Amino acid sequence: MRRQVKKVLREKADDSMKPGWDVYQPSNDVVYAFNHYMQGSQIDAEAREKAEKAFQEAVKKHPFHNNADHAVDFHGTTVFRNAKGKVCGVLIPKALPSFATSMAADVLECAVARTSLRSALFGGVSPNSGIAGYFDYRGTPVELKCRKTSFTYEHTKEWRSVFPMIDYTSAIYKAALPDHWKAQDAAVPDVVRIHGSPFSTLTVNERFRTASHTDNGDFDNGYGVLAVLKGEYSGLSLALDDYGVCFNMQPTDVLLFDTHLFHSNTELEAKEANATWNRLSCVFYYRAALGEQPCVEEYRRRLKKAKEEKSTSLSFNHIEQKDNGENTNKPAPVYPVPLTPFSCAASAWALRGCAAAMLTRLHGLVRENASLMTELFGEPVEVADGLPRRAPEEIIPVHKHTNVQMHYLGGFSEKGDILNEAMNKRHYLDKENLQKMFGEEFVNIWTQSRTHWLQLVKKEWEHQKETNPTRTRFSWNNTSAMNFAFFDLCDVAKQLMCGAFGDREVNKKEEQSFWGMFAAHLDNACINEIGMLQGSMGMHKLNVKLKDYNFGGTRYLKDMPPEEQERRRRRRLEIEQARRRAPICNSESGDWLRNEAFDYQTEDVAVNYEREQWITPENNAKRFGFPERGVYGAEGAATGTISVLIVLPKPTNHRQKTCELPTSREADRIMKNPAAQRLLCAKPCNIGLSTSSNKSRTVLCGNIRIDKVFDGGSVGGKMYDFVIMRHLLAATTGEREPLECLVRWTSLARYCTFVVEVDLLDRHHYILKSEIGEEYSAVSEICFSALYSATYARDKVNLRTTPCLLSFIDKSGNMLESRFKFNGSPLNTVAFVVRRREK
């Protein structure tokens, strides 16, 4: 069953889930967990049309973006700035010591833990998210606000294992962006800062992919920090959607970024739909509401109460109202940067200073002079009439066809196949299954409430049968004790549902699905446990009463005497407390719901790095070479001549013989676009150089000196600022030749090399529909080889995919900084920015 996240259908984020509110799993996408279960194919055409229109409008507000939607993938240490020079993101690979992320992951996995019951009830693999640290809980039904999260409260001892990761992350933030770190550190109230850091809250996500969103509630004058703690996966890069760039992240990597920019995750790069993968990530941030007056007053109230009770373990004597700044929760303004391979390379931290200034100069020149871009790379940054973009119908959707929210009247749908599904899953509410998820106390409450209602139903049924022995249908008395017992049982069931969904807001389809199983469970109990006839109670009657509970229960409560209203409220609180005390990851039970103690910072302990023989956070941050001012400074202007070497594949004596090309829709897409036709008709671009000479040819363009040479030729021992290897590896064979080619030419670059190649993988490779992907794979190599042969006059062509090219780059002793994708390129060209690995 495909499931898609509810959040794409809502305009406002659920603060309790930020920043993972609009997440989904690539193999388990959700707008509604039980879309087929609740609606199925029986929905009428008019309703389907309205639903699809509503869904499309929602997706416009919160779209999912794929890797192909972005021009740049950053891999190395990167500082990406907007057109006004403001830092948008800082990527630091291998930033955190692995022992620190491992220790933290062991604890924080419990914060997102779900049991197998939830998957059994609602299908698929549960996407997990949780919060730790401190939270304001505004806009939630939690009565007591501005305090520890339930996870932190219940895992005080284990929580200490997270502190090294907190310290390392804070030190990196301080070293890279000291001004913002200081502003955030000055604003966060001391009572809710995590281990002396400028963070108040962690959001932990497991197996999550987010749609485009901004993080609501973060401190406006700070940055959020994303770290990947553990995982085995490819893809899922963090993308800044308005800038067209992605940050590739793996375990121990850290990304500092402006969370008020729209961002999302690209697709999981796994071709098999059932591929095994996992990813645990953590977002560190300051929840600005915790510094606003309502929360400060709550801290003061608790402190005053603790003093009146003569508490001896107070960590504070007074609460200071700090300057919290202005937090508008509005998206940050966007100042786009035109993207070229040079601007892409200029973002590499390793190329800062003189190299970045040169790259910025080259970027400006190719922006002003499109012919210079073609002279250097063989094609423009973007080709309007080249390889066409994929149509939506060619791509596996994030969701299957879904039927979006309609007016909810409580209860559940009574369509035949849906009722059958509910009956098939009714046993998940049996006691032995509930014990897998909930503690004994809560299961006992469920059992007692269920037994009490069944006893009253049995008593009422027997009375009705005595009055009329031929009766076959149960008559429900709305004023009876049985009715009130049913409402009480519904209160217990509602807490069961909340627990199964991890206290997140449940969308209406999920809620209807649950109540359908609940009704099927009770109807079966009436038949098999108290001897009622098949259909005497019936799903329809229970559905009517569930609608009454959802929309009429509050009205009945208001009509009750005050003492009964208070008893019902206490009863509901008792049920919720029992459910929350369910053991998760062997947590220590605690009365979190009613906790009013002034227990801020009671979990804090010092970390002795010297005793543990761990690198200190400050020394760890120094590894990345950030200056005292951080990464804010823009590069100066380049002066003097910039030298560039272009290396071309040597043409053979004749073009590749014309071969019979396949005929198919995919072959036509590659070969018959106007840009491809121009390549086939034009003279090969490397014919102008003399094939009889092995020496380079020099072209001057202002203060740019461009040398051109064939692969195998000589440059007379010169070094160059930058080298552009233009489609060389496609002219090599085997494993050894491409490595030797890379080693030779990258060694001549003072700063970096651009490895420009055809990528045999379709840009949407991992999300192409299977029939489209198979057709593409069958023709792509022969078609692109024909285009390459026409462009470079080569007999033998060995085209490769990005993963294969990345392997060559790594084995050749080079480091990958980034990848640039030429939009619409008829050769599906990509440029890898690489530099020699430091010894």
Swiss-Prot record:
List the protein's name: Thymine dioxygenase JBP1
Relay the domain remarks: The DNA-binding JBP1 domain (DB-JBP1) is necessary and sufficient for binding to J-DNA.
- Which Gene Ontology cellular component annotation is one that this UniProt entry carries? nucleus
Q: Which UniProt keywords apply?
A: Dioxygenase, DNA-binding, Iron, Metal-binding, Nucleus, Oxidoreductase
Q: How is the cofactor bound?
A: Binds 1 Fe(2+) ion per subunit.
Enumerate the residues binding Fe cation.
213, 215, 263
What is one GO biological process annotated to this record?
base J metabolic process
Q: What is its EC number?
A: 1.14.11.6
Q: Which reaction does it catalyse?
A: thymine + 2-oxoglutarate + O2 = 5-hydroxymethyluracil + succinate + CO2
Q: What would be one Pfam family of this protein?
A: DB_JBP1
Coarsely, its chief localization is nucleus
This chain's source organism reads Trypanosoma brucei brucei
Give the coiled coil ranges. Answer: none
Cellular localization per UniProt: Nucleus
Q: Name one GO molecular function term.
A: DNA binding
Q: What does the UniProt record say this protein does?
A: Dioxygenase that catalyzes the first step of DNA base J (beta-d-glucosyl-HOMedU) biosynthesis by converting thymine to 5-hydroxymethyluracil (HOMedU). DNA base J is a hypermodified thymidine residue found in the genome of kinetoplastid parasites, which is localized primarily to repetitive DNA, namely the telomeres, and is implicated in the regulation of antigenic variation. Also specifically binds to base J-containing DNA (J-DNA).
Gene3D superfamilies (UniProt xref) = 3.60.130.30, JBP1, DNA-binding domain
